[in-house]
From Swiss-Prot:
GO MF term list: orotidine-5'-phosphate decarboxylase activity
PANTHER family: OROTIDINE 5'-PHOSPHATE DECARBOXYLASE
Record SUPFAM superfamilies: Ribulose-phoshate binding barrel
A GO-annotated cellular component: cytosol
UniProt keyword annotations, A-Z: Decarboxylase, Lyase, Pyrimidine biosynthesis
Subunit: Homodimer.
Protein encoded by which gene: pyrF
Protein name: Orotidine 5'-phosphate decarboxylase
Amino acid sequence: MSACQTPIIVALDFPTRDAALKLADQLDPKLCRVKVGKELFTSCAAEIVGTLRDKGFEVFLDLKFHDIPNTTAMAVKAAAEMGVWMVNVHCSGGLRMMAACREVLDQRSGPKPLLIGVTVLTSMEREDLAGIGLDIEPQEQVLRLAALAQKAGMDGLVCSALEAQALKSAHPSLQLVTPGIRPAGSAQDDQRRILTPRQALDAGSDYLVIGRPISQAADPAKALADVVAELAL
């Protein structure tokens, strides 16, 4: 497998295997990793992960597990056995849930995926949090959940680029994975708390998840190359 040389993760947000692989075949695994989310995984199951790995890609399995500690830990273990590079769980599942996931990975003798916690979804604003009983700013909730993740031994967090600077300051050892990245001139779509790729890296993000600006581009390979150029890597 060719090691990726950039922080870019391209979201394969498609309903079918054929559509996802059509995009993957236009991308260079040295220039990006790929993210498999709920829609594609539900449609294709574990087979899609193996196929993408065979093409040379490191795979971020973005299923945001959230259940009782044992159930979540067993799901993370299964993901590790697929050979994924990164897997995530919801920090709101609590300290015991995250710690159980850390423990099950630490018991593995083989390669371990990065274990990433999801804080506050980038589509959520203060009024959305108020609607579920949290009368606080998104950044405050992110910092609360980040402290739990650090205590549980997580490798990093999914967070908005707007929270990255504060998180790096508070938890410098955590790797930050940032969705909602939109190259200059792109539409915001349903992501609210966004920055450009360069702004996100400068703010402290370690990995950048980019979807539609690459996946729906007329020339995805060029769109990816343009982002790499924007980052001056």
